[in-house]
From Swiss-Prot:
InterPro entries, per the entry: ACP, ACP-like_sf, PP-bd_ACP, Ppantetheine_attach_site
Signal peptide positions on this chain: none
Family, per entry: Belongs to the acyl carrier protein (ACP) family.
Organism expressing this protein natively: Geobacter metallireducens (strain ATCC 53774 / DSM 7210 / GS-15)
Span of domain Carrier: 2-77
Zinc as UniProt keyword: no
Listed GO CC annotations: cytosol; membrane
PTMs per UniProt: 4'-phosphopantetheine is transferred from CoA to a specific serine of apo-ACP by AcpS. This modification is essential for activity because fatty acids are bound in thioester linkage to the sulfhydryl of the prosthetic group.
The protein's name in its UniProt record: Acyl carrier protein
HAMAP family the record matches: Acyl_carrier
């Protein structure tokens, strides 16, 4: 597991209040981890802050799972 993978999973678990064991690469924020639209906005903001990147609204809508977030951050850092 890369440092990005590990940190994304930690942030997701912290932001959504779920156990890190539930945060698998395939996990959907809404369907599997119980996030609502506000949670996903806050999650994107936390990822932007942690990785010092800006995620456009258009791109944020495409980030639906843990793997989507990891892929996006890997490509943009």
């Amino acid at each position: 597991m890369s440092a990005i993978d590990k940190r994304v999973k930690e942030i997701v678990a912290e932001q959504l209040g779920v156990d890190e064991a539930q945060v698998t690469n395939e996990a959907s924020f809404m369907d599997d981890l119980g996030a609502d639209s506000l949670d996903t906005v806050e999650l994107v903001m936390a990822l932007e802050e942690e990785f010092d990147i800006e995620i456009s609204d258009e791109d944020a809508e495409k980030i639906q799972s843990v793997q989507d977030a990891i892929d996006y951050i890997t490509e943009h850092t």
